[in-house]
Amino acid sequence: MINSTSTQPPDESCSQNLLITQQIIPVLYCMVFIAGILLNGVSGWIFFYVPSSKSFIIYLKNIVIADFVMSLTFPFKILGDSGLGPWQLNVFVCRVSAVLFYVNMYVSIVFFGLISFDRYYKIVKPLWTSFIQSVSYSKLLSVIVWMLMLLLAVPNIILTNQSVREVTQIKCIELKSELGRKWHKASNYIFVAIFWIVFLLLIVFYTAITKKIFKSHLKSSRNSTSVKKKSSRNIFSIVFVFFVCFVPYHIARIPYTKSQTEAHYSCQSKEILRYMKEFTLLLSAANVCLDPIIYFFLCQPFREILCKKLHIPLKAQNDLDISRIKRGNTTLESTDTL
């Protein structure tokens, strides 16, 4: 699915900036890899101590797994793009690791969508009890999400089956069969559609949540300002990460995919679209470094255990507990877990 390790054969290629593709981008991915492994390793360690007692927690744990696995694909891309690895490594990137990259990226996106729905249901519709918020249902839904993403992506592994000679530069699309190219195009459109649907639902749900919380706190002046700021911060952090990390890539993805699978694009146009895709894909990859920050803002149990492990006292915890007991409102209880 990623064709970043490759360029056109010499007789068909335009002038290329190898400084960008073979040095700058690999170095940036190396930085993201180191930060991503460390941050998600710590996040996984902390979540190991967080009980899976709520659907919200289960979805977050799935995101941690997806981000960690996605981070493990970065070294293959780094070695392939920089030319430090053997040519067979580029084939492996085209056939396997790039597909795993996309699977885990979209798994993460879908689970953030499920979290927004779960928070909407609990905060805006607290009296509507439903089995969809049960732990068992959330675990089943998590399995279904992983299976569906794999079903969409695995054919890209199977259908990238064309033989390849020993070359220094490989174009991933040329390793696909005719059916593989069609599936590549269709699956990319489906994944892009999934993102935009989740992104729009995210905006709708969190707009409704914000209105609900602000209306709730209009009834009480105590701690109203601080709670509003906290709620706004939590919501803004999620939407900000989605907008910065994923929107640019999904704007660039469609024209880039068309340039791969349609013949009327000029060589120069293909190169420009490839650079756009590479840099926006890097932004998407950087999401693995930002998600742990979201966990800290979003999940109170995560925050409490992390601070406990680091021996950092939580500020105003007593005031928060008193406020919850005094008001006894479901919306208020959910403020720290948006």
Swiss-Prot record:
Listed PROSITE patterns: G_PROTEIN_RECEP_F1_2
The organism's place on the tree of life at top rank: Eukaryota
Gene3D superfamilies assigned: Rhodopsin 7-helix transmembrane proteins (1.20.1070.10)
Record: glycosylation sites: 3, 161
Positions on the Cytoplasmic side per record topology: 51-55, 118-139, 210-234, 300-338
Pfam families: 7tm_1
Keywords carried by this UniProt record: Cell membrane, Disulfide bond, G-protein coupled receptor, Glycoprotein, Membrane, Receptor, Transducer, Transmembrane, Transmembrane helix
Cystine bridges: 94-172
Upper lineage: Eukaryota, Metazoa, Chordata, Craniata, Vertebrata
Bilayer topology annotation: Multi-pass membrane protein
Molecular-function GO terms, alphabetical: G protein-coupled purinergic nucleotide receptor activity; G protein-coupled UDP receptor activity
Name under which the protein is recorded: P2Y purinoceptor 14
Summary of the tissues where the protein is detected: Highest expression in the placenta, adipose tissue, stomach and intestine, intermediate levels in the brain, spleen, lung and heart, lowest levels in the kidney.
Family note: Belongs to the G-protein coupled receptor 1 family.
Subcellular localization(s) per the UniProt record: Cell membrane
Role according to the record: Receptor for UDP-glucose and other UDP-sugar coupled to G-proteins. Not activated by ATP, ADP, UTP or ATP.
GO CC list: membrane; plasma membrane
Extracellular side: 1-29, 77-96, 161-188, 256-278
Organism listed in the record: Homo sapiens
CDD domains per record: 7tmA_P2Y14 (cd15149)
